């Protein structure tokens, strides 16, 4: 992964509501983030189910997943866990180093669009010196940083049942 190679927002992220949202909510240095679109494919096809994958450990990249458009046919599955529907109006995070995937259970009426934000929990980018430096949160568990509002403001933390 080269998440730390991404040190600047794209042009799109500096306009309109996206800029307003990021400026008002984000408290840590953003790294590899995206607006992910999963087209409505045929269920159980190789295109409908993203392959199982792992991302960086949470101490390197803590992610927040915000559904923009979705429907109940799009499900999220983590290795060793149940299958979940990520609902609109909520933000989600998990240990992305545990294998996970998105799957489509039936034809969906719309495409799935999620805002996936990655944050560096323990390092901040110094634009002037063009380097990463450890910050005041060094060693604090990234999930506790979320609970304490150190990463992203306005999150209500709910425990999965």
Protein language model regions, located:
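Signature of the catalytic double-stranded beta-helix
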Residues: 1-48
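Short, solvent-exposed loop/turn segments at secondary-structure junctions
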Residues: 40, 57, 69-73, 92, ...
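A short beta-loop-beta micro-motif enriched in histidine and acidic residues
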Residues: 46-64
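Short catalytic/ligand-binding loop motif for oxyanion handling, primarily in non-cytosolic enzymes
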Residues: 48-50, 101-103, 123-128
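Short beta-strand His + acidic residue motifs that chelate non-heme Fe in jelly-roll/DSBH
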Residues: 51-53, 74-76, 94-107, 116
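A short hydrophobic beta-strand segment most commonly corresponding to one strand
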Residues: 62-67, 91-95, 107-127
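A short beta-strand-loop-beta hairpin characteristic of the jelly-roll/cupin
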Residues: 67-88
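Long, compositionally biased interface segments
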Residues: 117, 123-161
């Amino acid at each position: 992964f080269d998440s730390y190679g991404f040190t600047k927002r794209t042009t799109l992220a500096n306009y309109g509501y996206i800029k307003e949202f990021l400026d008002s909510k984000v408290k840590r240095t953003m790294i590899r983030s995206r607006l992910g679109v999963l087209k409505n494919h045929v269920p159980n096809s190789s295109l409908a189910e993203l392959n199982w994958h792992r991302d960086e450990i949470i101490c390197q990249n803590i992610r927040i997943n915000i559904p923009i458009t979705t429907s109940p046919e799009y499900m999220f599955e983590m290795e060793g866990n149940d299958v979940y529907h990520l609902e609109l109006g909520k933000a989600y995070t998990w240990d992305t180093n545990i294998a996970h995937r998105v799957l489509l259970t039936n034809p969906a009426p719309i495409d799935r669009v999620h805002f996936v934000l990655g944050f560096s929990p323990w390092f901040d980018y110094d634009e002037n010196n063009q380097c990463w430096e450890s910050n005041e949160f060094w060693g604090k568990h990234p999930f506790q940083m979320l609970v304490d509002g150190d990463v992203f403001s306005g999150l209500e933390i709910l425990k999965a049942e």
